[in-house]
Amino acid sequence: MVFASLSACGQEPDKRLHADGKGWRIEQAVVIDKKRPRVLLVGDSILNGYKNQVIKALEGKAYVDAWVNPYHQSEHLNDVLLPAILANGPYDVVHFNIGLHGWQEGRIKDGTFEPLTKGYVQAIRKALPKVRILWASSTPVTTKGKPAKLKLEPEINSVIVEHNRLAARVMVEMKVPVNDFYALLVDKLNLARGDRFHWTGPAYKLLGKKVTESVAHELKPHL
């Protein structure tokens, strides 16, 4: 696996939303067999928790790159940063999540969430006309504290729920299959870490299994 430091890896000024790992980065598999399909996983710090499981599960079947980034919906992301990452392909499957860095007031202007999210999907299809795309909803945001006493954080999580709803509507319109991370974990708050945004190993194992199964399904024509 090759680690690349690109401007596309970005910075996150909100210290609550740290990378939870080796930092914001793109990890690129070393491609030896050019006939083997390629996969790109896109996400925030949550991706750090499950990407290795997916990479291991698909070993020998597909090369898996991972872009761990702190971005939210924006024209700059769609027009500049995302195309720069996609140029590392070509990819046969792109599995993406974008959401935990867009809840702060002012980051995404009113009325722009859906068109920008649609533009994100369009940017992928423009760069990779034959690609299979999968979208994952954002995970729940909890209160801080011990796992046994955690609840949903009322203010931030309500924004996450609304953004998930709007994004899901875009995915229906764009005919993009959905991995509902939120639904998978919302009744398992005891698996949250207690820092509001991140999760424990068992939760990431559930996410990794879900991603592996869905990506493997989309790869069937290539295997």
Which residues does each PLM region occupy?
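Loop/helix-junction capping segments adjacent to catalytic residues or to phosphate/diphosphate-binding pockets
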Residues: 48, 74-75, 205
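Active-site beta-strand/loop signature of hydrolases that rely on acidic residues for catalysis
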Residues: 42-43, 94
